């Protein structure tokens, strides 16, 4: 599975909420942060069909908005747990 990419803006409250969630759940080493202030990440986000942040690319699908991103990260976290 591809490493999920979190497209965000530093000054945006909803992006900050998602970044805090990632840190609080100790997923920093499992999620790639992509600041769309820079052309590379902005171009990659556009290439996935998006422009709004926060957004999460899971390798297959783009999830947009803090609630959708956190829900997808929770699902990925559940998949990574062993029984």
Model-derived features with residue positions:
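Alpha-helical elements of the RecA-like P-loop NTPase motor core of helicases
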Residues: 16, 43, 71
């Amino acid at each position: 599975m591809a490493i999920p990419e979190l497209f965000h803006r530093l000054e945006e409250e909803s992006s900050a909420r998602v970044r805090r969630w990632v840190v609080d759940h100790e997923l920093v080493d499992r999620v790639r942060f992509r600041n769309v202030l820079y052309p590379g990440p902005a171009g990659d986000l556009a290439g996935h069909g998006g422009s709004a942040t926060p957004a999460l690319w899971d390798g297959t699908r783009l999830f947009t908005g803090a609630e959708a991103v956190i829900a997808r990260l929770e699902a990925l976290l559940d998949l990574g747990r062993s029984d």
